[in-house]
């Protein structure tokens, strides 16, 4: 699928982005290059390769789970403008 300046304008509209018409051709060229690289990756033979999350089979050392900061919930709730049942009350923003 080739991307032209019309497709760039449609996608920019859907994404609520402003794209200058003079930049549209350069942007479509770059997007076509990206799609060509993706197509090249899709042509790679991966038969017999197990799915993996990371190319290296190593595990990260984990630090001990130690409390490093005090719980200041009560102090924060004490200065909140409105609290109910231990929770902050905020104005409704969605009807």
Curated annotation (Swiss-Prot):
Keyword field: ATP-binding, Ligase, Nucleotide-binding, Protein biosynthesis
Which Pfam families does the annotation name?
Answer: GatC
Q: Name one GO biological process term.
A: translation
Please indicate if the UniProt record lists Ligase as a keyword: yes
Where are the coiled-coil regions? Answer: none
Q: Which domain of life is it from?
A: Bacteria
UniProt key word Protein biosynthesis: yes
Listed under catalytic activity are: L-glutamyl-tRNA(Gln) + L-glutamine + ATP + H2O = L-glutaminyl-tRNA(Gln) + L-glutamate + ADP + phosphate + H(+); L-aspartyl-tRNA(Asn) + L-glutamine + ATP + H2O = L-asparaginyl-tRNA(Asn) + L-glutamate + ADP + phosphate + 2 H(+)
Q: Identify a single GO molecular function assigned to this protein.
A: asparaginyl-tRNA synthase (glutamine-hydrolyzing) activity
Q: E.C. number, please?
A: 6.3.5.-
Q: Which InterPro entries match?
A: Asp/Glu-ADT_sf_sub_c (IPR036113), GatC (IPR003837)
What's this protein's family per the entry?
Answer: Belongs to the GatC family.
What is the role of this chain?
Answer: Allows the formation of correctly charged Asn-tRNA(Asn) or Gln-tRNA(Gln) through the transamidation of misacylated Asp-tRNA(Asn) or Glu-tRNA(Gln) in organisms which lack either or both of asparaginyl-tRNA or glutaminyl-tRNA synthetases. The reaction takes place in the presence of glutamine and ATP through an activated phospho-Asp-tRNA(Asn) or phospho-Glu-tRNA(Gln).
HAMAP family associated with the record: GatC
Q: How does it assemble?
A: Heterotrimer of A, B and C subunits.
Q: What is this protein called?
A: Aspartyl/glutamyl-tRNA(Asn/Gln) amidotransferase subunit C
Taxonomic source organism: Alcanivorax borkumensis (strain ATCC 700651 / DSM 11573 / NCIMB 13689 / SK2)
